């Protein structure tokens, strides 16, 4: 196992329905005990435009859950001499409510599997995450788009569905 304080893990024993925290996750309380870890506590709800720009974060003036901005938003620092027009958003701009997920690295260690005709079933496994690169860890694929590495990924904040009344 790992002893690094910045590697967080869990061992899942599916047969016995047992979950055991590992490495830096040991002795942490559920929820707030993980807030200081960027992969978990660094998540932020935001409004993302159709072209992938963050217009506002939850708690900021202008944040909206209506599907469009209800007021103009200027993300330029106050007093900026030459404001970046890409950081200005007009009221009515179409946005989605997303969760900004900071990048993280992961490692999966299967401990017990059962062979089946078509593949295998995992019975016991260890999952590890780290905010920083570690030997044997991989950057989660959500942070690689068209071969380019990104510092954040945007995930849906709400479940979605399609409905047709016809």
Which positions does each model-derived feature cover?
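Short, compositionally biased
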Residues: 1-166
């Amino acid at each position: 196992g790992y002893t690094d304080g910045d590697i967080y893990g869990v061992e899942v024993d599916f047969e016995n329905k047992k979950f055991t925290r590992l490495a830096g996750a040991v002795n942490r309380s559920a929820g707030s005990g993980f807030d200081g870890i960027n992969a978990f506590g660094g998540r932020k709800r935001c409004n993302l435009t159709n072209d992938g720009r963050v217009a506002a974060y939850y708690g900021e003036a202008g944040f909206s859950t209506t599907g469009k901005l209800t007021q103009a938003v200027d993300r330029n620092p106050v007093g900026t001499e030459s404001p970046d027009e890409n950081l200005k958003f007009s009221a009515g701009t179409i946005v989605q409510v997303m969760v900004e997920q900071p990048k993280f690295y992961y490692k999966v260690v299967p401990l017990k599997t059962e062979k089946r005709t078509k593949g295998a079933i995992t019975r016991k496994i260890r999952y590890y995450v780290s905010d920083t690169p570690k030997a044997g860890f991989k950057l989660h694929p959500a942070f690689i788009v068209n071969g380019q590495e990104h510092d954040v990924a945007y995930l849906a904040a709400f479940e979605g569905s399609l409905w047709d009344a016809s």
